[in-house]
Amino acid sequence: DEISEEDIETYYNKNEKNFILPTPIIKAVFFILPKNAPNLKEVKKWFKSDKANDQESLEDYCLTHAKKYDKFNNKWIEVKYILNLIPGDFNTLEKEILVVKNIEKEDDDNYYFLKINEMRHEQTLAPLDYVRDEITLILKNKKKLQFENDLEKQINEEGVRKKYVKIY
């Protein structure tokens, strides 16, 4: 039994208080380049740009040269998972991320780039697409429980009707 999009949205809207974010989430692009990677000046230009062709160039470049390349443009991810991959003090980075959309850091071997496209702060309502799977699971479990309760009720009623069962 499939859960409809309408059912999901209705549940979400009626239960917003249950979907408050405990931690910030982002949609972003994250990559790590070795210090000796070619054309770093060009990469930094693409990184700062919002033009589609620059973003394509950046993606092509990263697929070839990056030690790690993650594109979370269509999927929300908790900030802490990305911040753990970037050198520096976690709390300082977490504060910086609230203000700056493009973060560049380095250590002895690598450059770290994080380009934030969308962000939701903690203690705000989670976006529906972030909690959709959770809501679907809740609604499926509710349907299953309702089915089990209805089945038990039917069995009891039939048992009483056919005098297999006496309820005291």
Give the positions of each predicted feature:
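Peptidyl-prolyl cis-trans isomerase
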Residues: 1-168
